[in-house]
Amino acid sequence: ETKDIADAGGPSPALTTSKNPDLAPLIERVGLEPCPLGDDDPDAAIPGLPSVTFRCLGDGPDVNLSAVRGTPLVINVWASWCPPCIAEMPILASAAADLKGQVQFLGVDIEDRDSAALMMMEGFDADFPSVVDNKGEIRRLMAISGPPVTFFVKEFGVIVGRHNGSLPDDAYLNQLLIRYLGIRR
């Protein structure tokens, strides 16, 4: 397993903190899947994702990570300013498309500009939903020193696997999907 990759250049100083109506045409053009609706009453006794709410990058409601249940989940923490994140985005986009209906993919875009994040996703035809963490809260809550980091979460909300660093290729992601979620692609 690779180690956490430190910030590659860092975030842009101008962070977007709320949905910008000027981005509506770009959001529509990118066509991200809607953000997932969470369970209204997740069982707090089950150890799993932190109870933190992030704004949806595309259309859809804000998302409380601890409430996303019901389907196996792959969470990728990324940023448009992160070269390893850019390198792995096509791998994630392809897997999300191939496994639609079997596995939910959710990106957590950290310390980024919405426009840059949307343009990156558009460039790779990545349409899986992403949420926005402008303040980098997920770093503290999930012990992340820098993106990318990928988490594998069972349908009932328990984190069963974590990969620090960029996913090198489809075959490696496929191995992780089998190991942690029992899902073949």
Located regions from the model:
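A short beta-strand-turn-helix
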Residues: D41-I46, S51-L73
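N-terminal targeting signals for export/organelle localization
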Residues: E1-S51, R185
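Thiol/disulfide oxidoreductase modules built on the thioredoxin-like
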Residues: M119-A126, N134-R185
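Short active-site neighborhood of thiol/selenol oxidoreductases, capturing the structured segment around
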Residues: V63-I86, L92, F105
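Structural microenvironment flanking redox-active thiols in thiol-disulfide oxidoreductases
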Residues: I86-F124, N134-L141
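Solvent-exposed coil/turn segments that connect beta secondary-structure elements
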Residues: L57-D59, S80, E111-R113, A126, ...
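Active-site acidic short loop of glycosyltransferases
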Residues: R69-T71, G101, I144
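Sequence contexts marking disulfide-bonded cysteines in secreted/extracellular proteins
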Residues: L32-G38, R55-L57, P83-I86
